[in-house]
């Protein structure tokens, strides 16, 4: 937790409840944009709807075993490249090809689901990066859809080809290794490096110096793995001294776990959020980058792959 963050957050929590969440607090966010998160029960209303493409981001084998009727399959591997490190943002040209071949145009609403809490959000962030904002992720993913007794299909889908034009990558959603290093060397109090890996990973392999640790799992309810409510999210992050007016740079091991945190923070009103796409894998691979280890911990050893 950042210095004095707990006392500040506690005060703000009382203030929020005193005026009511959505009242006049300077830290209150009023949702004016469509939600990025779609309840599993709501998906049935979009199946077969014109202008909507439902995307299953699971593996081809999982898709073949049963998927939402009419859903196309875009596994995460189709929207990333492994250069210079694993799971980097793929090219403009590749995104245009993948989206177009799956019937997605610039006017299409995309609704994505996964089974790992990461794939759908990574697709959302990727589309944001290339200028497409009409995207939603299904809360709770495939497990939540299965619990709704939604009719599944094992038939593959052959969508009509569409034209998708990707814009130049949006720098406001992306952070580079150089920018992270600049923050380490000359910290800006308004900028926060947010490490969403587990504390176990920190103890085993270290972290980027000055970064705040907050496991991405804290954004989900432990039972059904759905996103926590916006109000709970605001309080959780304020308790760590992370406010909507801060500039936040997210990272994990390969930037997959950072994606659902991006979605949840955006949903809670945070707009100055970027993902360090090279993530800790790139950072720790560069011998010139400093690494912060907890006192008394063992030497770094490679661990998680996401």
What does each model-identified segment do?
Residues 1-10:
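Bacterial N-terminal signal peptides that target proteins for export
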Residues 26-31, 84, 89-178, 257-273, ...:
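Thiolate-centered catalytic microenvironments shared by cysteine-dependent enzyme domains
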Residues 29-107, 181-245:
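Positively charged, proline/Ser/Thr-rich regional signature most characteristic
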Residues 59-62, 77-81, 115-119, 142-144, ...:
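Solvent-exposed loop/turn segments at secondary-structure junctions
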Residues 80, 143-208, 288-306:
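Active-site neighborhoods of enzymes that stabilize oxyanions during catalysis
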Residues 235, 240-296:
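C-terminal soluble interaction/assembly domains
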């Amino acid at each position: 937790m950042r210095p004095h963050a707990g006392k500040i957050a506690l005060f703000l929590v009382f203030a929020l409840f005193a005026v009511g969440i959505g009242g006049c607090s300077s830290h209150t966010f009023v949702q004016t944009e469509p939600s990025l998160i779609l309840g599993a029960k709501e998906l049935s209303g979009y199946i077969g709807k014109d202008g909507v493409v439902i995307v299953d981001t699971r593996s081809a084998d999982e898709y073949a075993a049963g998927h939402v009727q009419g859903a196309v399959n875009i596994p995460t591997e189709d929207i990333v490249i492994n250069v210079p490190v694993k799971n980097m943002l793929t090219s403009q040209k590749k995104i245009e090809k993948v989206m177009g071949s799956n019937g997605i145009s610039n006017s299409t609403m995309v609704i994505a689901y996964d089974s790992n809490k990461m794939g759908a959000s990574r697709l959302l962030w990727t589309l944001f990066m290339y200028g497409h904002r009409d995207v939603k992720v299904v809360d709770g993913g495939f497990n939540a859809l299965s619990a709704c007794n939604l009719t599944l299909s094992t038939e593959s889908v052959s969508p009509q080809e569409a034209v998708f034009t990707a814009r130049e990558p949006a720098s406001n959603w992306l952070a580079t290794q150089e920018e992270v290093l600049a923050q380490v060397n000359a910290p800006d109090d308004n900028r926060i490096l947010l490490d969403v890996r587990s504390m176990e990973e920190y103890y085993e392999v270290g972290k980027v110096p000055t970064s705040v640790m907050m496991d991405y799992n804290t954004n989900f309810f432990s039972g059904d793995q759905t996103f926590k409510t916006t109000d709970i999210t605001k309080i959780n992050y304020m308790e760590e001294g992370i406010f909507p007016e801060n500039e936040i740079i997210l990272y994990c091991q390969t930037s997959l776990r950072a994606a659902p945190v991006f979605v949840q923070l955006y949903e809670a009103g945070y707009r100055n959020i970027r993902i360090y796409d090279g993530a800790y894998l790139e950072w720790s691979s560069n011998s010139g980058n400093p690494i912060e280890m907890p006192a008394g911990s063992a030497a770094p050893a490679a661990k998680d792959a996401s």
